[in-house]
Amino acid sequence: MSQMKKLLLHSLLIISIISQKLNAQNVKIGDNNGTITFEEYEPKSTLVVPQHPLKKAKFPFIDIHNHQFEMDNQEKVARLVKEMDKLNMGLMVNLSGRGWTDNEAKSNATLYDQIENTRKNFPNRFAVFTNVDFSKMDEAGWTEKAVAKLADDVKNHGAKGLKIYKSLGLNVKENNKLVPVDDPRIDPIWAKCGELGIPVIIHTADPAPFWQPVDSYNERWLELKTHRERKRETSKGDFSWEQLIEQQHNVFRKHSKTTFINAHMGWYPNNLSKLDSLMDVFPNMYVEIGAVIAELGRQPRAAKKFFEKRQDKILFGKDSYVPDEYETYFRVLESEDEYFPYHKKYHAFWRMYGIGLSDTILKKVYYKNALKIVPGLDKSKFPE
């Protein structure tokens, strides 16, 4: 074969390969001409397995992690209670007691009005946690004032606990520098919670991938693409993820007489062996499962072992209030279903598997553990 023919055949082969690749990229899929994106790819599973969707919990439950901002409105709370009844939610804990304002008068009114409205019109269906205003930490006497307000909220107005937002460590600044979670000026507040016998639910940091490069290896790539404000940069002054977690743990260690509920399982739901070891180190630490059910639902065997071992320290929480999303939580905790969808793709592009917890453990997670550590809740609506 002449050199010219060889060259021609080689060229034709290259053209054929390129053509095949281009055709593969331009296959018409549905109404989409061209390559589909990761966001668009939503294959319908062909797997045929038993399905047991759950619209309500098997037992009445306490949602320890919820946020409501109009609980002073009787009509809106009445609608909320009807939704709670459909889910079998016996009691909701509103962690946003003081709302989002740093105006002291408005903050006080928000807390007092919603506690009074729910106590008067919907008794025993809600508990409200108070909050701390960190925006004035640089003012003289801030610590003493914050401790006094906390005590007043609990003793005289009926607040059942303290919620600390992730802004502490991520956003709260003094002289243009972030205030650490373990700032010593906050120590008297943690100690006061122990004296008052109320729990502190604390959200520190965010998922570790928020500190990692936004590339094809980042498991939270889609979330960071759609919520760019969640990306953290130590080069721009942010604490590292490891620093924030250590700051939080310093607080737990220093205040062993105070009960802490580590929100979102302390961002270790994807490393249950590590979380298990931390629960040995910090006997005053409980965890709740808000916004991390997707992590548990992809490791059903490991999750079940963890729940069996730590059944006395885990609480049910949801975080964002979207009634239709509770079904995923019920199904992961109660069923043994396989390969069912999660409700929010940017949180989890993988499928869920049920853990199949026993009734004994379900009762503890759903309500018994919360009744144990949140003071003054009505136990009559919950089975023994």
Which functions belong to the PLM regions below?
Residues 25-118, 146:
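An N-terminally biased module of ancient metal coordination in phosphate/nucleic-acid-related enzymes
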Residues 28-33, 106-231:
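Active-site gating/metal-coordination segments in enzymes
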Residues 68-76, 98-111, 135-144, 172, ...:
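Acidic-and-aromatic substrate-binding clefts and catalytic sites of carbohydrate-active enzymes
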